[in-house]
Amino acid sequence: MRNKPRIRFKGFTEDWEQRKLSEVVTINPKTELPDKFKYVDLESVVGTNLLGFQVIKKENAPSRAQRLASYGDVFYQTVRPYQRNNYLFANIDKDMVFSTGYAQLRSKLYNYFLLTLVQNDNFVKVVLDNCTGTSYPAINGSELGKITVQIPSNDAEANQIGKVFRGIDNIITLHQRKLEKLKLAKKALLQKLFPKNGSQFPEIRFKGFTDAWEQRKLGDIATFSKGNGYSKSDLALSGNPIILYGRLYTNYETTISNVDTFVELKDKSVLSQGGEVIVPASGENAEDISRASVVKNQGIIIGGDLNVIKANHLLDPTFLALTISNGGQQKELSKRAQGKSVVHLHNSDLQEVNLIFPLLNEQKEISTLFEKMDNIITLHQRKLDRLQEVKIGLLQKMFV
């Protein structure tokens, strides 16, 4: 077994030590809870960020409220640990209490080194191997303490490593906040540039446009078809670009110009001509599938379980995708989606949607604005992805 990391700071050459986690941290130290405190449950930490807490009295607190935080404690998610929602408590509050869904790790090690250690792939893999349960795999504090870890024999090296990853995480958090602000700005503009509550006039408009918006059924001004075939198992490293329906939720904004998934072309594949608006035909809930994207380029395969809309001369495709995904049209789509564990949306449902739209020139102004915003959002997302890749690479090389 390798006992030295591949990348080290100058001056450190000693082998790393192999220790049980319980030998380097105190797990779930016993404390007395205050009469009133800020309670952090399992949904309150995402990644390494604390999203919020509840202020509650001790007598009203859930039985899981037991871990009173102290400066430097690391709270490790023991239920579904593959999510890696772990938090370093780095403030001086004396009244924050975490759920027993976290293991409380208190150590003399540099605390950011410890946080990074428990986020590492190697550690998470061993934890999962020792979990019980399938739907909600979990590990208790006793079993967690038995896990073997490798740490520097010199505390100064651990401190240096921790500082590197603290800096990287701070930069990642900054980019995440910028990205979230951009998405919120887009959402706010969508609410103001499209009419609400049955009105024919939006709250704000581009200069020179004053006419009322027109209302028509989507089926009167567009044609409809379906994508065809393909699943995740068909994906390849290269070949013909393809849009799979599941990636509409996570990988694409309103406009799709660049596609990073590929397959080998099959017979009867549906290829884009440019300007198709695609809407998921199924999903886990109505909100997921009540959204649309426009395929900008030709020659992209449109996979199965996608409804395909081709607008006529009255509609700009990007505008159509925007209006389907927001406001009254999105609410109408949500109501038409049918199903329980899986909901479905058919072209026949789309045809009945009441669409409200302005003249083509105003549509294009709106589309151009949001295409520019999407480009900026995509650019920031790529920067964030690259930073996360850098972090993963360093984790692999700076830990044993």
Q: At which residue positions do the language-model features occur?
A:
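Sequence-specific dsDNA recognition surfaces
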Residues: 22-29, 43-71, 219-231, 246-276
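Non-catalytic DNA-recognition/assembly elements of restriction-modification systems
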Residues: 8-31, 205-227, 352
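A short glycine-rich beta-alpha junction/loop motif
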Residues: 2-3, 96-101, 132-157, 300-306, ...
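Short, ligand-facing micro-motifs at secondary-structure edges
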Residues: 35-55, 71-98, 112-117, 125-129, ...
